[in-house]
Each structure stands twice: as structure tokens, then as C-alpha cells.
Amino acid sequence: MQARRLRNPKKTIDMATIYDYKALASNGKEIDFADFKGKVLLIINTASKCGFTPQFDGLEALNEKYRDRGLVCIGFPCNQFKEQDPGSDGEIEEFCRLNYGVTFQIMKKIDVNGPEAHPIFEYLKQQAPAEEYLGLKAKGAAALFKTISTSVEKPSDIKWNFTKFLISRDGTEIKRYAPTTEPKDFEKDIEAML
């Protein structure tokens, strides 16, 4: 079941920062990203039945280690890549908590690419387009992934589950990490932003 996405009054390209967006938590509560000003954000598109799902362990380790210093981790479940997150919002959140001890915020399931892509991910893709993936330039990676996922259309599109975005305290710096990048591999970037 596709979650309702919130509509912002402005188009994505007119948005100034990540703080102009809102999204729904898995319990249906509206989360206003303006509340995260002054925090370092780690936003991840997740899936519970993916080969990268064990990354929840590393993501939770970062969450536990740095949350008191200002890191906020937010997982957005997505079922666009080989339907690897088919459960309901409640089932997905329960899976994350029971199997990986996840304590960070899990949102309602969304699309990250295509006409129904959540505005937050449209903004993130615009601000931090992928330069390469698996050694391929973004255009080549998009062509490769289009063969396994119909949601990959543009070079900036999310290529797979567990693409990660790290956003600085003032929202002006956004770094993008490929699904193959383990959480421990960008810990230094988190420390630098904190």
C-alpha cells in the first residue's frame, strides 16, 4: 500500500533547504523537518528484504553513538526495487526494531523515483546527484539499473535500496552514499559535520 505523500506549497526546485519539507512517520504522525535545524541528518531509503538490509546494524550503531551529539537518522522504506519492502508500515517498523534493534525514526513507505517520488527525495537527488555507482558514471549506472528496476529513469535517480544522504547542521552540505557504502565507511564524514 502506497503511503500518502504530503504536498508542499512550493515545487521542489524552489525549495531552499531540507527544512521546508514534511513527511509522515510510520505511525501516521507528521514530521516537520524544520524541527531538525541544527542537527546532522542521515536519511536512508530502506528495505526489509534486501541484500543490504543488514546495514541496519551499522546504521543503528551510528545512531546510538552520535545521537547525543546531534545526529538524527531517518529511514524511509521503499518498495520500488524488486518489491523488497512489501509489508505494511507497522510490519516494516516492527521488523526493523525486532531484528536489528532500530531505535531511529522509520517513516511511512514512499517512492523515491518517478512521478510519485516523495518531495524530500526529489530535493535530495537534485542537491546531491549520483556521480558514479559501482565504478560506472551516473548515466551508465542509470542504464544498468533500468534493466532491473523500472523506477530508474535519470542519472540522479536512486539506484537501489540503502542509498544514504548525510546533511550538515545548517542544511547547506549534502553528501550522497551508494547502497554498497557501509555505514562505518562514512563515519568520519559524520564526525566532521558534528
Language-model-derived ranges and their functions:
Residues 95-97, 101-181:
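Thiol/selenol-based redox catalytic cores and closely related redox-interacting motifs
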Residues 174-194:
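Non-catalytic, surface beta->alpha helical segment in thiol-disulfide oxidoreductase systems
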Residues 39-40, 48-49, 53-77, 96-100:
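Conserved helix-turn-beta segment immediately C-terminal to the redox Cys motif
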Residues 67-88, 103-114:
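Thiol-based oxidoreductase modules, predominantly thioredoxin-like and allied folds used
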Residues 18-19, 41, 161-163:
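Short loop/turn microsegments at loop-to-beta-strand junctions
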